[in-house]
């Protein structure tokens, strides 16, 4: 795409410092220079703490609490925003430059309708009348591929999905036709399937309106779909800058090369392990049912979250559980831990039944099954020191106190590759990656047989997440611990797992070895997840959007049968008169995987090898 040669944004010698008033200041951004041409999308990429969001906010003349712009200039359309008065900055923000944040939920007032909030900026800046703003909002809803664009604005924020809310926040930012829009990690919290829709909508609207954009991210695969040029940052310094193709395929700086290497987790160790003999069974989950609400005549909860799910894991083995938000992954982990009592089924640990309610389990059973949650910020007490955090499970499970406890804390820190000095620090003072290592060390303090890892890398940037993955593999090799690894990232689950369970709407739709889920045929839902994982190449987004939005085969009314395939409404391979009339059964494929599908193995393989053609007319396999 051609861009005007004169820059819209010119950043020269930008320096940002942080610290307490009157105290010592630390430089966060070290004199960076870059430009953004009109109609261009520039990506700022780097790890957490690299300065990318700080730089992006400076384009609005803003510095976060405890920080200030200490030097340099930031010119937007020839005006240095660093010299503007508070009144002038208020007029600038939301009018000439707009901001799309990571958390759409935090950007909306739950007590006001969506439309009122989307048009508010246009009314404040008096760029149009209320009626004009409402019409413009509907145009944006349509351009952003939102459902029911004429009426969605009448809803409240809690009445739309996360992906829809993210696009509605984009409409809020774009309502005033800004010259520059800043997108700050806008898809980090989304599933891969939802991410495709949101990225495609953002890209389409930005290109159509001809505006400039800054895309802040730690994910190179996502940036490859959005940016014309990339600026690579670490420690507040620009390490490399260039066109997207050059950065992706011919990076010159070692730091950029490390970012690219972290995109695809290595699996050499997992390959070697996969060839070994099957380990002895440790955990066996049989027909687990969980949900909420009153009981039905069948004894099941009124709202079922898990629908007769099976899972089996051996000693020293990792079973990956993958699916979108709402698929039941976290509920399954909590059922295994006893935090959510199952209403049906059985859980065996070393062949012995585990009570379904955590209150009825013994201390020894609790010790053997530990859980590490996604968000270490909420899992750790921020005012407790690391030593105190790790000492508690040592005392509770093993009766270890005093000097012996301090020695064991030191050993645990060494295990998770943290320096000994961290022991005296409060957990709230640590980085995201350090907190997650402490979270893991706390679980290891119990000396468990099984650790339930619930999205343990999803809140971390690519490089830090890759380091945690490497740590998990190393700990498993040293300690023989088993993992249930829960994620929505197909690359991560393939990199660390021996076996993989695919959940959709609380049902197990596929189970197989890691190798079986590395190549088709898959269940149609597994194929969607695989196809939705971003690839490190420009143009992938357009290809993925075309695959994911292929027209579905029309079908008649469905039978009144709760056992029908849960993926029916989204499946590109559904068969009228079959999928909407009878429940599928688990079938075993040649590669050993089990899939819950009417389609034959040959149909699945043919469809997934030639996705553009489709094979809707082909008849299902005989039951």
How should each PLM-predicted stretch be described?
Residues 7, 25, 150, 244-284, ...:
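Charged, flexible cofactor/metal-binding loops and thiol motifs
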Residues 47, 190, 194-267, 460-542:
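P-loop NTP-binding/switch modules centered on Walker-like glycine-rich loops
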Residues 60, 64, 337:
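Helix-to-loop junction immediately C-terminal to a conserved catalytic motif
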Residues 68, 81-98, 116, 124, ...:
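ABC ATPase NBD coupling module
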Residues 132-151, 404-421, 530-531:
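Conserved ABC ATPase "signature" region
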Residues 155-160, 164, 426-430, 434:
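Conserved ABC ATPase signature
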Residues 168, 173-174, 444:
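ABC ATPase C-loop
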Residues 177, 447:
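Conserved catalytic motifs of ABC-family nucleotide-binding domains
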